[in-house]
Amino acid sequence: MEELKTIREVAILWKKDKQQYVKLSTLSAYALILENHILPIFGDKRQLHEKDVQDFTLIKLQEGLSQKTVKDILIVLKMIQKFGSKHNLLPMAEWSVKFPTEQKKNVLEVLSIANQKKIMQYVKENFTFRNLGVYVCLSTGMRIGEICGLKWSDINLITETISVNRTIERIYIIDGGKRHTELITSTPKTQNSLREIPMNRELLKLIKPLKKLMNNDYFVLTNEAKPTEPRTYRNYYKQLLKQLHIPDLKFQGLRHSFATRCIESQCDYKTVSVILGHANISTTLNLYVHPNMEHKKKCIDKMFKSLK
């Protein structure tokens, strides 16, 4: 049996192994979790005890991290533990962590129908390529990185679809203790995120006259060979909301607004899930489908009618 190593030493070997299988952006996220959360507490330990992990969890929650963020940190910790045990670098350890009951569920923030119409009308009357990106997001539910990565070649006027082929993001690179950021273009979040989305009539009206004049290799938001990055575009979007006197809403709220309007229009959940590029339908159901009392009553009434 090899000599037991510290969590820090195992993490280095684990990262090297992971490098072969995951995207650079995922590896970067793992590195940040290690540097900011795991290694400062567990780096010098040669064994993980359930009590230590439970205490760590509660401390992170008290620091203001959400349960989802803490769970993501624990997933990385568990992967390192499994890797270490498999290669006889750490002792076998099973631990289960309990989370306090959440008092209230986070409600997704979306645009009101009036404000959504206001933005879409403004874009039609005040065309810029950056404004077009907001309209595209409200019409397709694309993520900000996907919008930034959209090229004119991804827009097909014959099939009237947009192909989501790439995403742009700025990632942290940690190299020998030194940190720097890098803007990267990569494939979208998951295999399901590579998708084709139909364009509605209004979006086609905006895009059709432009598409024929544009260089296919150019990015839509800049109409240049160089893209804009999500942070810059997010700042522009915030200014747009301010200008239109619309309450502050995260850019992701545009995607949520699109999905919510689809569900409100009684689109079937599987189709909405595919359009959004979710890994599975349960993500869509958990995020957007929340039947109210009236819906529940109708469901039960419908069931009893079928018995007659």
Feature-to-residue mapping (PLM):
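Short, basic (Lys/Arg/His-rich) helix/loop patches that form interaction surfaces
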Residues: Q121-R130, T140, I197, K212-F219, ...
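Basic, Lys/Arg- and aromatic-enriched nucleic-acid-binding interface segment
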Residues: K71, K86, L90-P91, S96-I144, ...
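N-terminal core-binding DNA-recognition domain of tyrosine site-specific recombinases/integrases
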Residues: E3, R8, K15-F83, L89, ...
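Hydrophobic recognition helices of helix-based DNA-binding modules
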Residues: H37-F42, L77-S85, I207-K211, C262, ...
